[in-house]
């Protein structure tokens, strides 16, 4: 935890859309009179048939039902494209930056309209109808955005599967939502390496007899097999169709997309988002959290295969008529200056990335950052996991030169958009804290029995009432939706995250509740111990898990990756134990420290703690599915060098 407070800079108070007084006024209105508040905010998007009903929601476990703006009709692609054509047809909608730094493209709103209509007509020609599910398994290229918006235009439900997932994972997601059509590319490119997307698709489709059509975008030109009658080249089909396509009129509660997310148990859940409430919330959070002004160049580094890419590369920014940057590559290719070079090249004003990426770049030192200008930057954002204060301070001081506020955003695939975050012109920030709730969001902290905890406290984070961006169900399994989120603390949405609220009412996400350690009866979030370790000057990254301990119940097992060039010695191991004792207290002292050259991460950068827990428990006979790991070989090293070997 950092005690430092960073006040809102004076110039931000003047120019921000929301200042401190406006935040207080709007937040109170959103809680005290949600009907009136959301009636007004719903008008930020265009409706074909205006809504008269605002909110019809129940968190009662016997009748969980979430509906917003339910009698209104609209089309998401119209809100992202057509409504901007009168004023900004020639404005750049998407800047595409290729994996190769010499390749980029700029797509205007007029061009986006034509490309999306063409793609929509190709889908229709292949038999895709309103309500059909379409699986998109694509690299980060403009055609991925065209495909998503084309589905929205004709009322098909897209299910985007991250291009790093294995054929098995892809097959499971295709089967679960009964997709009849898959959109893919010949190959993807990341960090100079090719990813065989079409070959993976072919492998997956051996288990998916329901797929009748595969549309293939030619990206690298690599040789791929094409199955006659099923597979078509997108460019050939696009040449046959018109660049106009009338949008389908959709009910606010018609599905827009399904996105699969891992649960703590069982197969991935198909998180279902609908059209009206999601679009209102994505647009609104993008504008207020990032203080988006007309003309800003906005870059979110996520992949469209994750919810962050859906809400904050595509739907939110485009609904607001923004210029959004899509990046095919990785932060350290060809070298560790890549992100900062892209910011200079495209004069990016708002930059939104993940702590994992920042910690990796921190390891490389300041020089790769300092040799770039970054003078266009105005605002920095963090997403995906709690950001440790050390990384926050580096981000602020080194990347932002001490002049850019940081919005540390907390939300989930399930929430559709940001729930807790500073608004940069309204809320002073504390390194490591997501600070305050967004409009309409009522966080509560409860203990294990469900009792609401007041004031400064620690416990389980729940949300007390619905918001428009909330998921509506688990696709095809409403009972799982109810059991996962509404049974444990009846009448509340349970986030699965632990949280601390400080004496100023600021919220600090402490990690998943299943990442909580109980050491000698003391509760401790793994994020807290990790932050202490990473604060040591020789440590680049740390992950902490519990393991069975004869005396304490649970011991603390720390996996530590050192800064490049530092040696893993017994002296350093002892020094780190002393360091953590000093930072948090004796109760937090790691019992075992394993130096690790790398940690098992998914391709989106999340650490697979399940694997780390198994290794720490000396139980690696069943490590589960490791196909989603970016580098499965790190697991072998971790097992070989584990510190808790039996006997």
From Swiss-Prot:
InterPro entries: Ac_CoA_lig, ACAS_N, AMP-bd_C, AMP-bd_C_sf, AMP-binding_CS, AMP-dep_synth/lig_dom, ANL_N_sf. Keywords: Acetylation, ATP-binding, Ligase, Magnesium, Metal-binding, Nucleotide-binding. GO terms for biological process: acetyl-CoA biosynthetic process from acetate. The keyword Lipid biosynthesis does not apply. Gene3D superfamilies: 3.30.300.30, N-terminal domain of ligase-like. ATP binds at residues 384-386, 408-413, 497, 512, 523. It comes from the Bacteria. Acetylated. Deacetylation by the SIR2-homolog deacetylase activates the enzyme. Its cofactor is Mg(2+). Belongs to the ATP-dependent AMP-binding enzyme family. PANTHER family: ACETYL-COENZYME A SYNTHETASE, ACETYL-COENZYME A SYNTHETASE 1. This is Acetyl-coenzyme A synthetase. The gene is acsA.
């Amino acid at each position: 935890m950092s005690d430092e407070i960073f006040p809102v800079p004076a110039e931000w108070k003047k120019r921000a859309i929301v200042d401190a007084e406006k935040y207080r006024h709007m937040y109170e209105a959103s809680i005290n009179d949600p009907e009136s508040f959301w009636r007004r905010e719903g008008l930020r998007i265009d409706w074909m048939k205006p809504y008269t009903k605002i909110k019809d929601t129940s968190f009662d476990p016997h009748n969980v039902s979430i509906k917003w703006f339910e009698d209104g009709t609209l089309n998401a692609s119209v809100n992202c494209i057509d409504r901007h054509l009168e004023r900004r047809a020639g404005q750049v909608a998407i800047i595409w930056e290729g994996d190769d730094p010499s390749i980029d493209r700029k797509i205007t709103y007029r061009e986006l309209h034509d490309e999306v209509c063409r793609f929509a007509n190709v889908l229709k020609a292949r038999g895709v109808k309103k309500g059909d599910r379409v699986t998109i398994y694509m690299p980060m290229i403009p055609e991925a955005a065209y495909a998503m918006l084309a589905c929205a235009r004709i009322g098909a439900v897209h299910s985007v599967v991250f291009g790093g997932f294995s054929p098995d994972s892809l097959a499971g997601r295709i089967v679960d939502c009964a997709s009849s059509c898959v959109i893919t590319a010949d190959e993807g490119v990341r960090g100079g390496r090719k990813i065989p997307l079409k070959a993976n698709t072919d492998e997956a489709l051996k288990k998916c007899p329901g797929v009748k059509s595969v549309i293939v975008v030619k990206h690298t030109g690599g040789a791929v097999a094409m199955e006659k009658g099923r597979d078509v080249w997108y460019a050939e089909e696009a040449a046959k169709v018109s660049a106009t396509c009338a949008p389908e009129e959709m009910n606010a509660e018609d599905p827009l997309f399904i996105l699969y997310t891992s649960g703590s148990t069982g197969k991935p859940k198909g998180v279902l988002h609908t059209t009206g409430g999601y679009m209102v919330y994505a647009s609104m959070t993008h504008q207020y959290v990032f203080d988006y002004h007309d003309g800003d160049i906005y870059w979110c580094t996520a992949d469209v295969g994750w919810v962050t890419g859906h809400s904050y590369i595509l739907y939110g920014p485009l609904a607001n008529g923004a210029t959004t940057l899509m990046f095919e590559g990785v932060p350290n290719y060809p070298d560790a200056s890549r992100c900062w070079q892209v910011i200079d090249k495209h004069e990016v004003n708002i930059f939104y990335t993940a702590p994992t990426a920042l910690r990796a770049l921190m390891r490389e030192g300041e020089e790769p950052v300092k040799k770039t200008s970054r003078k266009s930057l105005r605002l920095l954002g963090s997403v995906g996991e709690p950001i440790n204060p050390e990384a926050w301070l580096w981000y602020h001081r080194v990347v932002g030169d001490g002049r850019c506020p940081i919005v540390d955003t907390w939300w989930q695939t399930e929430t559709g958009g940001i729930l807790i975050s500073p608004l940069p012109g309204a809320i002073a920030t504390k390194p490591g804290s997501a600070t305050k709730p967004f409009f309409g969001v009522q966080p509560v902290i409860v203990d294990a029995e469900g009792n609401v905890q007041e004031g400064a406290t620690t416990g389980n984070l729940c949300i007390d009432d619905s918001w428009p961006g909330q998921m509506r169900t688990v696709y095809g399994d409403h009972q799982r939706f109810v059991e996962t989120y509404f049974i444990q603390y009846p009448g509340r949405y349970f986030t699965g995250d632990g949280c601390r609220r400080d004496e100023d009412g600021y919220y600090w996400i402490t990690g998943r509740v299943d990442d909580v350690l109980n050491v000698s009866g003391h509760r401790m979030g793994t994020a807290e111990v990790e932050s202490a370790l990473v604060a040591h000057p020789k440590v680049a990254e740390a992950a902490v898990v519990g393991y069975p301990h004869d005396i304490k119940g649970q011991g603390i097992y720390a996996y530590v990756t050192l800064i490049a060039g530092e040696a893993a010695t017994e002296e350093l191991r002892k020094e780190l134990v002393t360091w953590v004792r000093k930072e948090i207290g004796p109760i937090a002292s790691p019992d075992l420290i394993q130096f690790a050259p790398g940690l098992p991460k998914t391709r989106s950068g999340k650490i697979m703690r399940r694997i780390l827990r198994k290794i720490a428990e000396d139980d690696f006979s069943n490590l589960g599915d490791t196909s989603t790991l970016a580098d499965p070989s790190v697991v072998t090293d971790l097992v070989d060098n584990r510190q808790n070997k039996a006997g």
